[in-house]
Amino acid sequence: MANASRISRRNFMQRSAAMAAAVAAGAALRPAGALAARDKELNILCWEGYNSAQVLDPFRAAKGATVKAESLTNDPTMINRLRAGEINVWDLINVNNPWARKIMAPEKLIRPLDRARMEPYFTKMLPAFKPPYKWAMDDSGQQLLGMCQRFGPYSFVVNTNKVSRATAEDQGWNLWNDPANAKKYGILESDDWNVFGICCIAGFDPFKSHDAGEVAKFTETAERVFKGAKLVGDIAAMNQALVAGEIDFHLTGGTYSASPARADGHPEIRRVTPKKGPMRDGLGGISWIEVTSTVNNPQLSPLAVEFLEYVQQPKTAHVVAFAEGTFNPVAQMGNPECFKLFTKEELDAIQWDSLEEEMTRSIEYDIVPDYDKLLDIMSAAKRQASAG
């Protein structure tokens, strides 16, 4: 959900005429044979985890089906692929919380679920997901747009042998404003999350339009933060550097990035959510919730909804939580039959002890209105720093 590469999102909030034409062309060019019933075929566009053989193989075997899943690390890229004609390819799309409600449903890229059939699953989830759950519903509150599963806080990660949890929570984003910390931290490559984090370091809410003064502050902060980084890399690079003592903390990060190191026996690698920050109500952290929706494919596979039901089952939900690559809490842990499957070590890996507390200190992932402008500024700062 968080290790993203540099992707252009110019005019992301506006559906272009070219993309609309591509959708129409894609449907027109679809071979006649491909329009046959797809009761043994399922295609999933998702974040890492749902593409795991651990998750897919039992479903393949049970249904005698060909199930293909492609994992990406960027929500807008997935959505733009639907816009560009792949609405005719995919059956399910798995992205972070705002996109179904704010973008994909209004653009008719996804179709509503049978609320009577699917909403009862929410009653077995953790209390925060009590139905009707905002991010799973359309603006009217009438249509169920997707199902929830993985979630978690995502601000930054520290090595508590170097920076205590208490210090990190109290200082929060100001860790990056202390000149003494230059070259003591890393930056996890993740375009959208790093834009969020740099806004927080600069002292303002990411999820609003920003005035000229804030943009100038963002520019200065991005240049300073990238110049002061010891390294920029992926999750594996960050965890290796933290464990080796090469860095003390990294931006951005959370359960999704820290859990593999913790599961490998490094409890000192810890997700941190600041106690205060620049978001509404003084909140200091940011959290994410995945929503999986059925694509508005004219030949949607009947297996799409069956797969959504499959991953709601306690045993499957536990597998999803600990699918290879990254480990995360799941909403289904509200069901005692699911929760009992988690070992003490697994609960520790996902920092269950402080999960609820940290979620309450976090604002939920949302869309940045002037994201393109800020991303261009941040990318320039990154290039400038790498050039020396």
Task: Name each model feature, range by range.
Residues 162-170, 204-209, 298-304:
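Short helix-loop capping/hinge motifs at secondary-structure junctions, enriched
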